[in-house]
Amino acid sequence: MSSKMIVLMSSDGQSFEVEEAVAIQSQTIAHMVEDDCVADGIPLANVESKILVKVIEYCKKYHVDEANPISEEDLNKWDEKFMDLEQSTIFELILAANYLNIKSLFDLTCQTVADMIKGKTPEEIRSTFNIENDFTPEEEEAVRKENQWAFE
């Protein structure tokens, strides 16, 4: 028996045929399916094709296949490889996961960024994310004093 297929259309005009059961991991898409708005495909105005490919890859991996369950350990290893991406791609995935309302992908991408920050000094964080320090030394000192609890 073949699964029902739906078409997802990226913001740059690419079309992707995906199993409905895989695509509805996105609450945004699930609501469109419920409202029967999928006949002509689902336009995803905020998601480029290179990011949609990654989202589909993630959803396919996380689609629950009762016949072939995946262990949590294997999923964690897969997640680690999946998130081995350029920063800009991770940020675009965060935006896509938020727009598509895929909580598990949103959590994974945000945790990846949190792990990039964990244990770093403000200077290291600025360097990692190319953030310009536009505080004067006096302003920076005032912020540090205000938030001393965070540095303990």
Swiss-Prot record:
Pathway: Protein modification; protein ubiquitination. GO terms for cellular component: nucleus; SCF ubiquitin ligase complex. The keyword Nucleus applies. Expressed in young seedlings, roots, leaves, floral stems, inflorescences, and siliques, with a slightly higher level in inflorescence than in other tissues. GO terms for biological process: auxin-activated signaling pathway; jasmonic acid mediated signaling pathway; protein ubiquitination; response to auxin; response to jasmonic acid; ubiquitin-dependent protein catabolic process. Pfam families: Skp1, Skp1_POZ. The keyword Nucleus applies. Part of a SCF (SKP1-cullin-F-box) protein ligase complex. Interacts with ADO3/FKF1, COI1/FBL2, EBF1/FBL6, PP2B10, At3g61590 and At5g49610. Involved in ubiquitination and subsequent proteasomal degradation of target proteins. Together with CUL1, RBX1 and a F-box protein, it forms a SCF E3 ubiquitin ligase complex. The functional specificity of this complex depends on the type of F-box protein. In the SCF complex, it serves as an adapter that links the F-box protein to CUL1. Plays a role during early flowers reproductive development. This is SKP1-like protein 12. It comes from Arabidopsis thaliana (Mouse-ear cress). The lineage of its organism: Eukaryota, Viridiplantae, Streptophyta, Embryophyta, Tracheophyta.
